């Protein structure tokens, strides 16, 4: 389902990405997180910042594995009160189950993006992904360009199962071009490196690069190594981030 999907790379002062945790339950080498240690966004500070920002157009909860946070339903419920067009969760899907999906939908979650990077990984998560799509219809599959995902059979399997899929560029373009299924036709270009494709009647999207977005983009992360989150926090007088790793020092944080 492309209609209404938030392309989480496209972020303005009306859209917001919320990286609630750098905790992880995998070792995905394509992950942009420089520090893979337990760092959790403070709920009260999140609420304080949202009150200062006001209503966002759309919010994406991502970074590390958000489902590791025991308060994720509470977090989504809070965020949903400050968005007009919905909330998206990006997850590797390992911790998804029908109960948590139902609870998140009740809290206001409207979109789910499940990241998979190999045919074997997709088959392990296929059943819960289909369950998620049944409960939250706007569920898609994200395929990052990495060594395991270069074979087009992964994308073909996902599309045949009826998922809308986005092929995500590695943040530093380290892994080359994904081989798209034979017969894929490019049908659109948004002018910012996102391309629409169609294969055998199935639609999917491909991210090209990240080079055309400027410093006004807001991506909330508890660490600040990915963008200007700490600058943004300072601008709204909210600088208290929860850090549980003493090895992280200010020289490694974006200022």
Predicted regions and their residues:
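Short, well-ordered alpha-helical microsegments
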Residues: 69-72, 96-99, 150-152
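Accessory C-terminal segments flanking Radical SAM cores
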Residues: 172-255
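Core AdoMet radical
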Residues: 33-41, 56-69, 80, 84-96, ...
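Catalytic cores of alpha/beta
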Residues: 100, 147-162
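Canonical Radical SAM [4Fe-4S] cluster-binding loop centered on the CxxxCxxC motif
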Residues: 1-44, 229
């Amino acid at each position: 389902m492309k209609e209404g999907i938030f392309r989480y790379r496209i972020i303005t002062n009306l859209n917001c990405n919320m990286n609630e945790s750098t905790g992880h339950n995998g070792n995905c080498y394509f992950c942009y997180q420089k520090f893979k240690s337990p760092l959790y966004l403070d709920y009260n500070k999140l609420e304080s910042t949202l009150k200062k920002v006001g209503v966002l157009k759309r919010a994406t909860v991502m970074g590390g594995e958000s489902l590791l946070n025991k308060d994720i339903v509470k977090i989504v419920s809070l965020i949903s009160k400050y968005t007009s067009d919905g909330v998206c969760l990006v997850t590797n899907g390992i911790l998804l189950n029908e109960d948590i999906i139902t609870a998140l939908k009740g809290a206001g979650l409207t979109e789910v993006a499940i990241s998979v990077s190999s045919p074997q990984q997709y088959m392990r998560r296929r059943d819960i992904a289909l369950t998620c799509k049944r409960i939250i219809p706007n569920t898609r599959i994200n395929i990052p360009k990495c060594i395991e995902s270069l074979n087009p059979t992964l994308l073909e399997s996902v599309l045949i199962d009826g998922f809308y899929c986005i092929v995500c560029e590695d943040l530093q373009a380290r892994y080359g071009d994904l081989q798209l299924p034979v017969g894929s036709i490019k049908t659109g270009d948004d002018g910012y490196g996102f391309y629409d494709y169609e294969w055998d009647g199935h639609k999917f999207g491909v991210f090209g690069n990240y080079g055309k977005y400027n410093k006004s983009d807001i991506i909330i992360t508890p660490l600040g190594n990915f963008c200007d989150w700490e600058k943004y926090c300072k601008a709204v007088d909210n600088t208290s981030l929860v850090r549980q790793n003493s090895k992280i020092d200010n020289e490694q944080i974006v200022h």
